[in-house]
Amino acid sequence: MNELQILLVSGKPLFITIDGFRQAMLTVFPSNGKIVEDKSDIKVVCGFSQAEVDAYLKEHTWYQFETHVALEEIKKVLAQDNDTSTVTLTDEFDDEQLPDNSIAYHRVWGIVTADSNWWFSSKQLAADLQAAEANPQISCHFLHINSPGGEAWYLDRLSETLCACQKPILTFYEQMCCSAGYYIGCHGNRIYALTDNDYVGCIGTMCSFYDFEPYFEKLGIKRVEAKATNSDLKNKTFDDLRHGKDEKFVHDILDPLNVQFLAEVRSQRSQLAELPDDAPVLRGETFYTPQAVELGLTDGSHTMQEAIAEAVTMGREYIDANKLKTAIYNIV
């Protein structure tokens, strides 16, 4: 089983929409029973030869390669627009040979996992943010999100990294920026959707999994379990949940994660901080762009080119502000 399959059947708390969970289950456990584990047989991808793909994958994860391919396609679009044709959008965050005012491209696509080679990784994003922060040629972070959410674990550490960034962050999402996706995206100094029909929100915490034991029993597969005399509480909370008694699991596990989630989005979005606890937006509701703007979840809609151009402006303002600080310090 790959990392995403293991996560989905683990019973771990997830920041994800119901539809996102179903989509993920169908993706990694397809109804035809054919699960493709090995992606290395791709001959040519968007102009990359097999040798180039192999060389890239020696130092990068598969997800980073997918991001690199996506970035190359975005660059082609930017090159056709006068306002963005000279912009340097990069995923090589350590490269100090980049032009001044380069923009770091961070892609948050699909299910959020903490640590994965095939899928988006919260740990990898944290490392990428730190690398881009340390590179003087990079002036702004561009978060490109299309995610229904995912794994809750490690998001608190990723949030710390995002909050510690000195360089501005622009969040740009398309289709959906939900649950764990919004946990990440809310750290943008500005947040934009691609269209009026993009989904955003689903701020909340849930756990969802399938109980296969009755099915296994029909196949004659019986689960046997024994606990030491003084280990009566071992896995009890989870077992109670599986048998329909969810009170302790909700109180001890889901509720604390949810408090953390709500505190984070309220600290990043001032309009959300002013809302009462029982506001629908803080109880897991999801919204299209126009209503999301009214609620303060997002700041409007932009084309990709407009969002990139604004990121360039934010980066330039950051550089100018730093130059002014340096000049003042030199005078003092």
Show where each model-derived region lies.
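N-terminal organellar transit peptides
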Residues: M1-N197, I203-V332
